[in-house]
Regions:
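Ligand-binding clefts/hinges and TM-proximal coupling segments of bilobed small-molecule sensing domains
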Residues: 172-175, 228-230, 262-291
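Bilobed "Venus flytrap"/periplasmic-binding protein-like clamshell domains
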Residues: 38, 54-67, 138-183, 189-192, ...
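Extracytoplasmic small-molecule ligand-binding "clamshell" domains
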Residues: 20-109
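Extended ligand-binding regions for polar small-molecule ligands
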Residues: 58-67, 147-150, 162-163, 240-280
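Hydrophobic residues within well-ordered alpha-helices
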Residues: 64, 91, 159, 200-202, ...
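A ligand-binding cleft/hinge motif common to bilobed small-molecule-binding domains
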Residues: 107-124, 175-179, 202-203, 207-241
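Periplasmic-binding protein-like
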Residues: 40, 137-142, 213, 221-261, ...
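Acidic, polar ligand-binding/catalytic clefts
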Residues: 74-156
Length: 291
């Protein structure tokens, strides 16, 4: 019995040793530093350019920290296999891959009631330790095409004849290879990322690219090619085609969420956030909460 108690004590102590501490709002203010997790190498939202952090999410995080009177510390987050993994590693449990440091705030998290209320196999909330809040962007799917090889995109049916590029294992990939009983699959070309798909379009390998609107806007902006156009087609049988992007904090840190929401609303209403998006060539739609 004593041996069992000793083993349990050791296990508990070990668990405490590796469990990262969630900072309260007061501790964050006292430290004078807001730690924000942003996705690594995810242009135009968060990336490094000649060693300098850039991107919409980076500039928004900088503005939020400034509004709260603290400095910003970025935590570059390589995306996991699932968003649940990222929330676990950066918001509530931590990971040895980044020295078990937790972020105070994580950017680019879906602001979606159904996702937030998902249950696991035993009926518990899948992300009970996380509060998802603060929608700051509306996102949707977008097709860009080269007018030198494609006159217009009235319907995705044109991709029975014209090749289109998508990121491998993405929603556009699954959609284009399955819609219309797979009639578009032969002309759907897969690439490691959206930037590679755009390079393929510029090289003439494909006539169009489908991805998230923000990524497409950025690629078109960077290409500065007047022959690249944005389609206005619909996506039949696709399901959810528009969604909002927000942020996340630990469920015990709602005070920080309230402070961030207050700062965010000011940036949206005075046009500052729209100006950030414009600097990267992105269209900006105000989230429904602020309309």
């Amino acid at each position: 019995m004593r041996l069992f108690a000793w083993v349990m004590c050791c296990l508990l102590l070990c668990g405490q040793a590796v469990q990262a501490q969630v900072r309260s709002y007061d501790q964050m203010i006292a430290a004078g530093e807001l730690k924000v997790a942003v996705y690594k190498d995810f242009a135009p939202y968060s990336f490094e350019d000649h060693g300098q952090p850039r991107g919409v999410d980076v500039e928004l995080a900088q503005a939020l920290a400034k509004a709260m009177g603290v400095r910003l510390k970025l935590m570059w987050a390589p995306p996991g296999e699932k968003l649940d993994d990222d929330l676990r590693d950066y918001i509530w449990r931590s990971s040895p891959l980044h020295e078990r440091q937790l972020a105070d705030l994580m950017m680019r998290v879906p602001y979606d009631h159904d996702y937030a209320q998902r249950r696991n196999d035993i009926g518990e909330l899948a992300n009970a330790q996380v509060v998802m809040f603060g929608p700051y962007q509306q996102e949707c799917w977008q097709v860009a095409y080269d007018r030198r090889r494609l006159d217009s995109v009235g319907s995705v049916a044109v991709f029975q004849q014209h090749p289109i590029g998508v990121e491998v294992d993405s929603v556009p990939s699954f959609y284009l290879t399955s819609v219309f009983n797979g009639m578009l699959s032969a002309k759907t070309h897969h690439y490691p990322g959206v930037s590679q798909a755009f390079k393929a379009m510029q090289a003439g390998e494909v006539d169009a690219v489908m991805a998230m609107r923000g990524e497409v806007d950025w690629q078109v902006h960077e290409a500065a090619d007047p022959q690249l156009a944005l389609a206005e087609n619909a996506y039949p049988n696709m399901g959810k085609q528009r969604w909002e992007i927000g942020m996340a904090v630990h469920e015990s840190n709602r005070q920080l969420a309230y402070a961030v929401e207050e700062a965010l609303e000011g940036l949206i209403r005075d046009g500052s956030l729209k100006a950030v998006y414009a600097r990267y060539g992105l269209r900006y739609e105000v989230p429904e909460m602020y309309q």
